[in-house]
């Protein structure tokens, strides 16, 4: 049995995430795309953190106290999207049934997940820049 180069790359990069048996190569490519969101958000934060400003009257302890629940929420959402395997084809939820029918809908799903993770990671990093 001969594996093509694409199959070898996909096998090497098989990351947990959303997968569809209807179009595995597209699904794997989008899954890889979604997994680049944390790197992109962290890079943006590193290059722009000096221009970001928080309210000067906030104490670091108060900021930690307020932001801890949000941090837990963001981390749990990121975990659900990046570190768990979900097969879209086998799901019986109506939304997923609609999404898995067309590649365009799958693209919008992955794109929404990407930007959700990107924004949440950036928002997660901003308050902690002075702490």
From Swiss-Prot:
Keywords: Bacteriocin immunity, Cell membrane, Membrane, Plasmid, Transmembrane, Transmembrane helix. It is a multi-pass membrane protein. GO terms for cellular component: plasma membrane. It is found in: Cell membrane. One of its GO terms (molecular function) is toxic substance binding. GO terms for biological process: bacteriocin immunity. Its main location: membrane. The chain crosses the membrane at residues 66-84, 104-124. This is Colicin-N immunity protein. It comes from Escherichia coli.
